[in-house]
A protein has these predicted regions:
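Solvent-exposed, membrane-proximal periplasmic/extracellular interface segments of envelope transport
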Residues: 12-86, 147-168, 189, 486, ...
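Transmembrane alpha-helices and their membrane-interface boundaries in multi-pass membrane transporters
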Residues: 351-365, 387-406, 413-452, 572, ...
Length: 979
């Protein structure tokens, strides 16, 4: 939300604008976080809704109502607060209108055609939102000489009032007869500069002069402009457009590109439109990559099935895979799911899992056919024995993924579709295994009875059986040895690096540059040209887009855009030839910018995955006194500067903004017939200008502004000679007669969070550094400083962590919030399936060990522990529980094994059960191989952790579970009802 108050200081903005708006908005219960930033001349507020809100439109309507309610109570001069609820999503396409001639660019012409381009993009079918960037804004300037104006006895405000009063753009009612209605209008509306020049202005002496005789009129862009944009160092105006959600991005972008081509053909000489970004290519590439991974995984899974199960069984399971996939995709639409990167990744993850039920059913039918059962008898017997265990294993695996689906917030929205796709695939797999596999068995499996395979033996099978026999003979020793692996993994967990989400795989990066708060937009633009020139010289850089005074258009989903009306801010978007070029240039560029432009704070940032945050590491200090907050901020900034990977530190609230203060002699002011209010109005009108109506030109309305010539407005020393006009001083009075001026420091910004003042101390890191490492170092330094007295927090002040750490902790907390309830549901499912608490305990002990196996796999891969790793380990636990259920059910099906007979248990493990476990493990691992070797940092760590963790989990399945079963269940007589 933006609430401009031109000329006001941050203290005035906070007290008169930000706090009243906050008080009004805090009555809306759905608002979870409300932040405000009071800068010179503007209040910027941002709000975050509660995760429970799923339909935001009614809330935005209530916010607008609250803003409308509070607007009349705000001081005169505060522009109507505006809610910008359309900026939370990335644009689908961004185009730039650029100047192609060698002559200086014509900003007015560029902005006019940029507006036309915006209109045409808005007409593309499926367009939701458009916006222009780098728009300075056209206006008509009435430039007056203060001495000449003073001689006429007029002030800027009086002249502006005379101009606006002469505008005939008004209605004068209606003439209503019995048969007609006639609207009465006035002639003389402002439709050209010549019309303005002919306005009669009455002086204080009663004379009438033409406006053109006492002022210079010119049409141009606002000076200084509110925003400027550059494309490769040349002036440009950018237009962004976003499609309506739920459409195909490739089809919409194709329509938008056709519109751009048609518009380019209509442009006059000197103008050209250039596409600088479109989302479709990134989406198509990503979907193409994951589709290839899906196909490769499918091929590997089927190939392994043929190697491990024989061609008849493999063909049966192989036919179940596409059937399961098709059923999964068919269920997407009724469930409100879409086909995108995350849902396809979910199907890839489920590839091995979806063959699990089919393998179990196929093996069971095959064994019964070998025993001579008919197809009907074999099917009936297999369904009777396996329907409930398969349902239990499917439900427990689904429940393992359920916390991810139930997780609220941005992180849940990001990974939720992956887990949902896995769950839908598991349900589809269960249905296919019960319906399709038995239907295929008479054709593919019944013939194995006529040709029973000759038993084959080899050294690996003999070694496997020997190891299992030793395990069953010495169960306690086997359990201790097996436990060493997961326990060791959990013990080494503190040594892992932590990363919330990995960096994005993008051939783009962005640079945020901040100058001192008092910097003008002209100074920032000059710096932009230098930075652009330097960046464009780097190898692999294709395009540089610069945005001065405002944030760049969102070209990536989690970039914060809250720098409106900030002349000291520069945002650059750099396009490179490849991801490799981005990774190569970013580290060195950060150092080069710091050395070449020490007057600015330059932060080179790669795009990141997951929830957005303002800075990688952040501390928030809450309190009331600005001086105390400033001092604490500087002390904490000093601690951050000591961290080895920190490049820049910002402590926002500082008294570092120079302010020109007028020390008013109130007696002299009163003697001159002036008040403090009239003095402020005259000085403000002379420096910033005074609105004086609108010039109507075709469909364009250009604001008219009366102001002093540039020399008077840009020279502080000229301020003393400013002439004040009053009824008592006809010839005017110099400002120096009633006030003395001096420079004083003032607050550059005042930030608030949830109705409290907060000092934000933010640290930026070198490229590819892990924020968690630096945050841990900072926490240690902070605790040491608090303990030894180097840093003292006054009563009523507190410090809280922000940045990546806060987002990570919040996301993990939300993920684990529903785990307890779902664990209870899983326990109930397994207990009811086996009618035994001991068997359920075996299952969940195995699941706990799988967690440790996942940590060991992560240690082996060398990746950081992040949010997607947590998601992967939760899935791994579900798979391990599934395998354990199958083994326990197999033991229970054999009367001798249930009683603890070693040979019977060995036969169960080394027979169809081991074939099932091995096939499922290898197929799941094979299905993940394409993701393991994929490019980027998001999916390889996930796939490697799950894949290798699953291989390690077979130790639990083959050694720990049989040993514990023999100790707990078999020794008790094997009766589930008694355990």
């Amino acid at each position: 939300m933006l609430a401009p108050y031109p000329g006001a200081t941050p203290e005035q903005i906070e007290a008169l604008v930000a706090r009243p708006i906050e008080q009004e908005l805090r009555t809306i219960a759905e608002i979870d976080v409300l932040e405000s930033t009071s800068r010179q001349g503007i209040a910027v507020l941002s709000l975050e809704l509660s995760d429970a809100v799923t339909n935001v439109t009614p809330v935005w309507s209530r916010v607008r109502d609250k803003l409308s309610d509070v607007a009349p109570s705000l001081p005169e001069g505060v522009q109507t607060p505006e809610l910008l609820d359309d900026r939370g999503y990335a644009f689908s396409i961004v185009a730039a209108l650029r100047w192609t001639l060698d002559t200086p660019p014509n900003p007015q012409l560029m902005e006019r055609y940029a507006e036309r381009l915006e209109d045409q993009l808005r007409q593309v079918a499926g367009t939701e939102y458009t916006h222009r960037f780098g728009v300075a804004g056209e206006q008509v300037e009435v430039m007056v000489d203060p001495l000449e104006l003073n001689a006429l006895g007029l002030s800027v405000g009086q002249l502006a009032g005379a101009i606006e009063a002469s505008d005939g753009r008004r209605t004068a009612g209606e003439v209503v007869t019995q048969g007609h209605r006639l609207t009465v209008g006035l002639s003389g509306e402002f439709d050209a500069l010549d019309r303005l020049r002919e306005i009669n202005v009455t002086t204080q002496q009663g004379q009438s002069v033409k406006l053109g005789e006492i002022a210079e009129l010119r049409r141009g862009v606002q000076d200084p402009p509110s925003a400027v944009a550059l494309l490769n160092g040349e002036r440009a105006v950018f237009v962004g457009a976003r499609m309506v959600p739920g459409q195909r991005i490739d089809a919409w972008v194709e329509r938008a590109q056709a519109q751009l081509a048609a518009f380019d053909d209509e442009l006059p000489i000197g103008l050209a439109v250039e596409e600088v970004f479109e989302q479709a290519s990134y989406t198509n590439q990503r979907l193409s990559d994951v589709a290839i991974s899906l196909l490769m995984g499918l091929v590997l899974v089927v190939a392994i099935l043929f190697l491990t199960m024989g061609w008849r069984s493999a063909l049966t399971v192989g036919l179940a895979i596409p059937a399961t996939t098709l059923l999964t995709l068919a269920l997407f639409k009724p469930l409100g799911m879409e086909i995108h990167q995350m849902s396809i990744i979910g199907i890839i993850v489920a590839l091995g899992l979806m063959v699990d039920n089919a393998i179990v059913m196929t093996n069971a039918l095959r064994e019964r056919f070998l025993q001579g059962d008919s197809a009907l008898a074999a099917t009936r017997d297999a369904l009777r024995h396996l329907a409930v265990p398969l349902l239990a294993s499917t439900l427990t695996t689904i429940l393992a993924f359920m916390p991810i689906v139930l997780m609220p917030g941005p992180a849940g929205e990001f990974v939720g579709p992956l887990a949902m796709a896995v769950m839908v695939a598991l349900v589809s797999s269960y249905l296919i295994s019960l319906l399709l596999v038995p239907a295929l068995s008479p054709m593919l499996l019944a013939k194995v009875a006529a040709k029973p395979p000759a038993p084959r033996d080899n050294i690996m099978k003999r070694a496997f059986r020997g190891t299992i026999r030793s395990t069953l003979r010495h169960p306690v020793a086997a359990m201790v040895v097996t436990l060493c692996v997961p326990v060791g993994g959990i013990a080494l967990m503190p040594t892992l690096d932590v990363a919330f989400f990995p960096l994005a795989d993008r051939d783009q990066f962005h640079i945020e540059v901040r100058l001192p708060a008092a910097s003008s937009i002209a100074k920032t633009e000059a710096l932009a040209h230098e930075v652009e020139s330097m960046v464009r010289e780097l190898p692999g850089v294709v395009r540089v887009s610069s945005f001065i005074g405002e944030s760049a258009p969102m070209m990536y989903y989690n970039v914060l855009t809250n720098e409106d009306n900030n002349p000291a801010f520069l945002h650059l978007i750099v396009d490179t030839v490849s991801l490799e070029a981005t990774n190569q240039q970013v580290p060195g560029l950060q150092q080069s910018l710091d050395k070449r432009f020490p007057q600015a704070q330059s932060v080179v940032r790669k795009y990141e995955q997951g929830s957005p945050f303002k800075a990688p590491i952040e501390l928030r200090v809450y309190g009331d006194d600005l001086e105390v907050l400033s001092s604490l901020g500087l002390e904490l900034a000093g601690l951050m500067h000591q961290l080895p990977q920190v490049t820049h530190v910002r402590a926002g609230m500082q008294r570092d903004l120079p302010r020109l203060v007028l020390d008013v002699d109130h007696t002299a002011l009163s003697d001159a017939g002036l008040t403090t209010q009239s003095l402020a109005e005259q000085v403000g009108a002379a420096l910033s200008g005074q609105p004086a109506g609108m010039l109507l030109e075709d469909t364009q309305q250009l604001p008219i502004r009366v102001r002093y010539a540039d020399g008077w407005r840009t020279d502080a020393e000229q301020l003393a000679a400013l002439r004040l006009v009053s009824d008592q001083v006809a010839e005017g009075l110099p400002l120096a007669a009633v006030a003395e001026s001096y420079l004083a420091p003032s607050w550059s910004v005042i930030t608030r969070r949830n109705a409290e003042r907060v000092q934000l101390v933010q640290g930026y890191l070198v490229a590819d550094a892990l924020p968690a490492v630096s945050m841990a170092q900072l926490d240690a330094k902070l605790q040491a400083a608090l303990e030894n007295g180097e840093l003292t927090l006054p009563a009523g002040y507190r410090i809280e962590t922000g940045g990546e750490a806060a987002e990570r902790d919040e996301a993990v907390g939300k993920l684990l919030a529903s785990v307890v309830l779902l664990v209870i549901a899983m326990v109930a499912t397994v207990v009811l399936a086996f009618n035994s608490f001991r068997r359920a305990a075996i299952v969940f002990i195995a699941g706990a060990q799988a967690m440790g196996m996942g940590i060991v796999a992560l240690l082996m891969s060398g990746h950081a522990f992040g949010f997607v790793i947590i998601v992967g380990i939760m899935g791994l636990v579900g798979v391990a529980i599934n395998a354990t259920i199958i083994i326990v059910a197999a033991f229970d099906d054999d009367p001798a094994a249930r009683q603890g007979d070693m040979d019977a248990m060995l036969a169960v493990i080394s027979g169809p059960t081991s074939r099932h476990i091995v096939s499922t493990t290898i197929t799941t691992f094979a299905g993940l191989i394409p993701l393991m070797v994929a490019a980027g940092g998001l999916w390889p760590p996930f796939a490697q952790t799950v894949g290798f963790g699953l291989l390690l989990a077979t130790l639990v399945s083959f050694f720990f579970t049989p040993a514990l079963y023999r100790l707990w269940v078999a020794s008790s007589g094997g009766e589930g009802s008694q355990t």
